[in-house]
């Protein structure tokens, strides 16, 4: 080997040891300039030094220097997918989205099996264009209703239009069919404004102005003067959550003529009491686990994070939901009456009396709305209606404490419009904990599976030491395993709480079960590190490596591996014993329309070519138990959580002809070797499923096999890709 440059490498290593990362970085670059042949041999350690240097610089807020370092690194290693990905992440973090896009795309063009680059690219696309844009634009019921209302209302060559929150500009395109004098469309998102500009131009919309601003930030001259007709669709599941009241009040006061009209002209929000154990378990601690934890009298609900309701596709739930009351109108508003809008936004109390239709229990409250676009055109999101628009989900008011009811009972419910957002009054004193902890504890099947392992665990540990000497780590969202061992006399427990609220709840549970807090160490949040365990050794370690969304948490995975290797007493017990990665090839129209636009659904206007570049290859938080899909393959094992880095092809047997567009993915957890397995593909599991999406669709045939690539990065991140040989 040419020795030139090697002295610089040695000096760079010395500088790194001394913490002089800047000088070390320069010395590596100097060495590579002297001797190009040595670059590949030293790329890994060079990247490590650059990472350390950039961390120091970012801490000092020297972002320009970080950018320069990445630029120099890419000049040296122009085809390094890792450096391209790292620079993309940096640009993403700094808000340079177009440049980040270029770097992720280039990394994937060099190696399409690179998992981290694809995940980062998906995250960027999700940020720039949220998935609901796809489902909304694919909703022909909504689209044709708005189109009909616009045609009914617009006076050709007379009306001037303001399209408030235009998104992709579809309503502006529909309005152009009616020859208005001029249309101004506004949106606060630069990406959506750029898309609207391209789409309106592509589809021949004349006399159209696109403004990249929220309507409430626009000046009158930017709108081109006062308008005679306002179009809007800025509604969420709770109707008012996207600040539509504030936006319309501002528009009436600043942007509209006195005799202007609004589409929709009116809106009405309804609530309905229901029994849905599936939803109840998502948001409140349920009776079975409260009995296990000995906290029967506590009302424990999910942390709200300043949200007053959640949203779900309730129409999928079928027999899992029973509507216990009639639907009752909570709010009806005329968008053409500015004073009514002002009165509504200040409403601090609204009471409705719900009439019970059958004896049973109410444990959740569902909200939906009607949009009266005109006197003749109405859209509903009523989950019971076959004519509903699926662009919007239904609102879930999750703080309703379960109540037993009898047919014809009157159940009062109280709401306010808190800052323009509907809020349901709480029934009673509520303690709040993280969604992760609620979901984990309400997964009774998993909690019972853990409990079923305790006897075997104690026998095994008893062969190592007296129970009073047993030390335990349990890094689950709630330490069910650790609590059982403490109640059997274990010496100590180290566990982790997602939030301070979780920590307080843990302490209450420990005290209710007569477990001394002096025996417990609770780590809080996500900032604790491996170093916090020092040189301690433990007899039993239980780790959770999953995020609620269904993804593997790489930080927790690395923590679990570290604890197993360095902090487990010899012959100690590590749980779970194994985790298998499972999958199945499917056809799902629902997954398709949430990720790909079809022009046939937008009246054959040319929109898909502009929106579909924002398609992603992976979706999270998928509830398989209520997902519409057709299985096309057998269920297959695609690997384990310990699968080695690289790419492996798995041949998947096909059981049904069809066009495949996704691989569903879940896990089988073996808690103790050869003793107990639990699948995560079931209703009420503590984690959701994930899907890997294929576009274009792949035709598969019964009796044949379809190859699926399992790609694993060095950190354990993985993806599945359906693959057909060219």
Which sequence ranges carry the predicted segments?
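Phosphate-/polyanion-interacting regions in eukaryotic proteins
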Residues: 79-80, 99-102
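All-alpha amphipathic helical-bundle segments outside canonical DNA-binding/catalytic cores
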Residues: 74, 79, 86
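Short coil/turn linker motifs that delimit alpha-helical repeat modules in TPR/alpha-solenoid proteins
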Residues: 41-42, 76
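Class I SAM-binding transferase module
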Residues: 2-38, 44-47, 51-54, 59, ...
